[in-house]
């Protein structure tokens, strides 16, 4: 990705005075064989996964009849994910709860980590650490996983008859129906990436221009929208899976 420079300039007398510059797109690479891997995305993703696994183990390692606060919280999250899955997928939602739950929790914690974890204090030879969902590679990977999931759901339920949906309700819509399946992962990935990147850029620019206390309301708004984006992604993933199993909607 080319370096994207966003500069805010103020006209002073005869020239422009640069107040703030924010660069996005520099990466720290690991060379693995003949491949270059975005190291900072892997590092932050591993941290998020460790947080999720550690929290789950601590909360439910010793289940109680009268649940503790941690166990109660995770049971609430599980019930919430089950409700979302059942609403969007229908009666056969059960096998898809782990997939939808994993998507929701990974995206939710990734988004919040961008605002709550001090990634910037860890210095890298190139680039800087940020939320995993701040990188287009992560959001595209999540969207492609979703695409693979709804194709698998449709084929496992209907076999090759799944592809008959492309000519419903009329064969004239064949190109549009095919295009729809290709645009779903694009819309999922760019919606999530754009919202998280824009939120972090706004906070960085405000912090560089005004005292820290001023951007705090924007940071709280970012936490709220980050949670909403995780819910939207998981809900759409469940809806696509339900649609592929039920037929043309």
From Swiss-Prot:
It comes from the Eukaryota. InterPro entries: ATP_syn_F0_a_bact/chloroplast (IPR045082), ATP_synth_F0_asu (IPR000568), ATP_synth_F0_asu_AS (IPR023011), F0_ATP_A_sf (IPR035908). The gene is atpI. Disulfide bonds: none annotated. It is a multi-pass membrane protein. The chain crosses the membrane at residues 40-60, 97-117, 136-156, 201-221, 222-242. Belongs to the ATPase A chain family. It comes from Arabis hirsuta (Hairy rock-cress). The keyword Oxidoreductase does not apply. The keyword Membrane applies. GO terms for cellular component: chloroplast thylakoid membrane; plasma membrane; proton-transporting ATP synthase complex. F-type ATPases have 2 components, CF(1) - the catalytic core - and CF(0) - the membrane proton channel. CF(1) has five subunits: alpha(3), beta(3), gamma(1), delta(1), epsilon(1). CF(0) has four main subunits: a, b, b' and c. Keywords: ATP synthesis, CF(0), Chloroplast, Hydrogen ion transport, Ion transport, Membrane, Plastid, Thylakoid, Transmembrane, Transmembrane helix, Transport. It is found in: Plastid, Chloroplast thylakoid membrane. The lineage of its organism: Eukaryota, Viridiplantae, Streptophyta, Embryophyta, Tracheophyta. CDD domains: ATP-synt_Fo_a_6. This is ATP synthase subunit a, chloroplastic. One of its GO terms (molecular function) is proton-transporting ATP synthase activity, rotational mechanism. Key component of the proton channel; it plays a direct role in the translocation of protons across the membrane.
